[in-house]
């Protein structure tokens, strides 16, 4: 297939950084046909671990491979020219493959169709390849994928068998294996070195539990983990030390938009039994796992007492200020009265001076 031919253009040597956990390099490519609206749109996004670092969009005013992380901006003009050329060439091949698949599935040109491809590699703490990926999907369904042995293919329907036979005829698996074991790993090490401070950090989650009434006798407890990196995290609920995996609602880890991630897990519990349930949070950024319970707010009586004390205290302060103001004003008025009385007395009248005849 023409789709895979351009992976081998990613050859480069790189310095292998010291690392303590697995890392991954992934490229996600998508082509969407738009009948009556011109050529299919083609998009590439590249990720190192959970961080997007490059993007290409054929609908941009000037389609180019663009940086999406500060650290990749260290690459020079040659890098961006080369990546842009490869992206544009890959886009042309995707459009050809879209037309080919229309024939395989006996589909018409007046419907929109989607072709997706993910490829990349994982490396372990020792810097060696853990696993390589090369997977293709058509209209949201698995189409063909390279097996974990990197030597054979899995086709998911009759149409994809055609692509499998073509790939086997030219030993496409050998080409993919060469890329995944070599250049893919080398590029990943290079990116880890360039983005070391960002990519190899561990931001611990900030966690708390919220309380949501569900019915007269049930409530939902939701355990939140916010602001963590990397994305790998485990949230569990326990009742008296036993995990509630089957009774727990768990959402997928979501990007927060600031380079960190968020996730929550929820359980429905009987009203009044909330304190028997604990949430446990596991993340590499934590020195030890977190254990949380729902903390009810202070009782209404306590709140009323506090409010009453504050009201009385405020009244005392205001009253004291008023009394002080009145006393000060009275002293001030008394001084002015004595002065006026003295000026008005006869001893200070001009008649005490010698009068003219």
Swiss-Prot record:
Segments spanning the bilayer are: 305-327
Q: Where is this region: Alpha-1?
A: 21-110
What is its subcellular localisation? Membrane
Task: Provide the membrane-side ranges marked Extracellular in the record.
Answer: 21-304
Disulfide bridge positions per record: 121-184, 223-279
Please list the residues annotated as glycosylated.
106, 196
Chain segments carrying region Alpha-2: 111-202
Q: Where is this region: Alpha-3?
A: 203-294
The record's similarity note reads: Belongs to the MHC class I family.
Q: What does this protein do?
A: Involved in the presentation of foreign antigens to the immune system.
Q: How does it assemble?
A: Heterodimer of an alpha chain and a beta chain (beta-2-microglobulin).
For this entry, the protein name equals H-2 class I histocompatibility antigen, D-37 alpha chain
Q: Which organism is it from?
A: Mus musculus (Mouse)
């Amino acid at each position: 297939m023409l789709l895979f031919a351009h992976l081998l253009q990613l050859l480069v040597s790189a310095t292998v950084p010291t690392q303590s956990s697995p890392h991954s390099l992934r490229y996600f490519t998508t082509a969407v046909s738009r009948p009556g609206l011109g050529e299919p749109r083609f998009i590439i996004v590249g990720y190192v671990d959970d961080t997007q670092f490059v993007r290409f969009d054929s609908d941009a005013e000037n389609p180019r491979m663009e940086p999406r992380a500060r650290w990749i901006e260290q690459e020079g003009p040659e890098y961006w020219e080369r990546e842009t050329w490869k992206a544009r060439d890959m886009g042309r091949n995707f459009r050809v493959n879209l037309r080919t698949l229309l024939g395989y599935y006996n589909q018409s040109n007046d419907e929109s169709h989607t072709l997706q491809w993910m490829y990349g590699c994982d490396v372990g703490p020792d810097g060696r390849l853990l696993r390589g990926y090369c997977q293709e999907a058509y209209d949201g369904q698995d189409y063909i994928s390279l097996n974990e042995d990197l030597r054979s293919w899995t086709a998911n329907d009759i149409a994809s068998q055609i692509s499998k036979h073509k790939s086997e005829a030219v030993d496409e698996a050998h080409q993919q294996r060469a890329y995944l074991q070599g250049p893919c790993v080398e590029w990943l090490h290079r990116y880890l070195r360039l983005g070391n401070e960002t990519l190899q950090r561990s931001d611990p989650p900030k966690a708390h539990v919220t309380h949501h009434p569900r019915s007269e006798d049930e409530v939902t407890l939701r355990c939140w983990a916010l602001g963590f990196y990397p994305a790998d995290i485990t949230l569990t609920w326990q009742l008296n030390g036993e995990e509630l995996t089957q009774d727990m609602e768990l959402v997928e880890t979501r990007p927060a938009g600031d380079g960190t991630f968020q996730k929550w897990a929820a359980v429905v519990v009987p009203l009044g039994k909330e304190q028997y349930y604990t949430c446990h949070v596991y993340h590499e950024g934590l020195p030890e796992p977190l254990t949380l319970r729902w903390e009810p707010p202070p009782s209404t009586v306590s709140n009323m007492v506090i409010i009453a004390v504050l009201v009385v205290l405020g009244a005392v302060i205001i009253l004291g200020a008023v009394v002080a103001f009145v006393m000060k004003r009275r002293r001030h008025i008394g001084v002015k009265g004595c002065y006026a009385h003295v000026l008005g007395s006869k001893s200070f009248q001009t008649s005490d001076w010698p009068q003219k005849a």
